[in-house]
Structures are given as C-alpha cells and as structure tokens.
Amino acid sequence: MELSPSVVREHDRAAPDPSETGTATFGLGCFWGPDARFGALEGVVRTRVGYAGGTRTDPSYHALGDHTEVVQVDFDPERTSYRALAGRALDAHDPNRQVRTTQYQNVVFAVTAAQRETLAAVLEERGLQADAIETRIERLDRFYPAEDYHQKHSLRGTPGLQPVFDELGYDDVELRESPAAAKLNGAAGGYDVGGDLGAGLDLAAGPR
C-alpha cells in the first residue's frame, strides 16, 4: 500500500477530535526524540513540542529563559492512559539523576488532581517518591509551542514525507497538529507505527 495524500487525509479525518482526548506533557531531554517516540505509540493521537516549566513569557529557542524543552501528547483515553504514558516517560530515563542544564531536564507534568494522584501511584509502583527523586514533578502552568522548524523534526528530515502534506495544503500549524504527521514522524524516527500509514513507509527511502 502506498503512502498517498488520500491516506493521510483519511487518517486525520478519522482521528478523535481534540475535545475527546486527554493530554500529557513531559520533558525528556531534546524534544525531537520524544516527539517521535511518543507519536508512534498506540493510542497517541497528536504531539507537539514546546517549552514549559519556567517563568519567562513567550520563550523561544534562542531566548528560553528558565523553561525546559517538552513534548505534549494528546491521547485517546479509550486506547491508552495518562498512567501508561507517565510510566513510559519515567522508564525512558533514570529518575535518580538529572542534567544540570534546565533546557534538557527530565520533568513530568501533572495538570489535574486526577493526574497528580495517578502519577503518585506510578511512582509508588517503581518504588519512588516525588520528593526523593531528581526528576522534576510539577504542575503545568502554561505550554508554549516551539518554532515550526522544531515540530515533527524527523518527518521534516525524511525525503518525500513533507511534500505529501504540502500537496494537501497543510500549513505549519496543521502539520504540527496532524495525527498522521505524529505517526509518520514516529516512523521516520525509527519506530514501528503499523496501520495504514506504516504500511506505506519505507524508513530508508520515505514513501514508496
């Protein structure tokens, strides 16, 4: 099956509406890798990268202030959960170690009381406590999307993928928020995504 604009369009049309999804936000070093890793996961609908956790208003990559690079994940609660995603975030690094540079620190954000309770349970399952680990456990006050060139970085760097979205007339925001782009970015990052999109992608050469 070839990856074609029609496949991308139908995948996006069939995806859950943003109002039907939950959201999780994590800092796990440079946000390019986590964007691909989480985008490939079952139940993840959309991803975007950005900045959070600091006090500077309207940060940018070159004026980051005390913010951290993060990936924000929208997920279908009927197919995955905040618990599962937070567990993956914790398992992706050593919670007992932290890098010095705030930009690349490990942080797990919890927005609601339910997420905070869930996160405490996930930590307990691993024999961890929020106040005894190096990973930052914080409430999310505000998320600032990163510049367009940081969004779907693996997809943008894989020959033949972005032109599919260009042919559909997607602008940068639509590419960032595209469920198909999240999956294809994961595939371009080396992860198995399966389904209609994965069937049409040759990781070595882009779309067949």
List each language-model region with its residue ranges:
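Flexible coil/turn and secondary-structure edge motifs
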Residues: 1-208
